[in-house]
Amino acid sequence: MNGPKTISLPLDGGLFNFRVAGVAIWNDKILLHKTPSDNFWSLPGGRVDMFEFTRDTLLREMMEETGIAAKVTDLMWVVENFFAYDRRQYHEVGFYYRMILPELESQEDFSAVEADTDLLFHWHPIDKLHEIMVYPDFITADMIRNFESTRHISLSFKDLHII
């Protein structure tokens, strides 16, 4: 949820975000979500609140979005990301953690609402990620399967309205 404590700052004509996302894998599928109007999928998560640890952010966001108590494990990626979305330019720093969702008993699609935004959650086969639009686009089957230690990733500017 975007509140007064959220680290999302308008600066110099753009918006700086500090974001955390989770990589949940189950039965060779990865959990992704999107809004009904987006043409791309992304990892679930949200913005960090001031004085909040990033692991706690992911726990809070998963509870807010899904009602599920996630277990946050390894930090996989630290990502510097520049993109345009919804008529704004973003500079985003993101922490991406592996997470376990023990309360999910099925891999059925489900919906949630976060800050008046509808979200569709879907378990996508990891081997078929290349068939859908995933953003950030470094998220591939190889990146997920070949995780050995935390990596720093820098992404070039991308306009999400034209992907």
Residue ranges and their predicted role:
Residues 36-41, 106, 113-163:
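Nudix hydrolase/Nudix homology domain
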Residues 26-64:
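Conserved Nudix-box catalytic region and its N-terminal flanking loop in Nudix hydrolases
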Residues 17, 25, 38, 43, ...:
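Short connector loops at helix/strand junctions that flank enzyme active sites
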Residues 1-21:
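Acidic, metal-coordinating catalytic segment for phosphate/diphosphate chemistry
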Residues 48-71, 81-135:
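Unchanged
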Residues 21-23, 29-30, 94-98:
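Residues embedded in well-ordered beta-strands
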Residues 14, 40-41, 79-84:
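Short, solvent-exposed loop/turn segments at secondary-structure junctions
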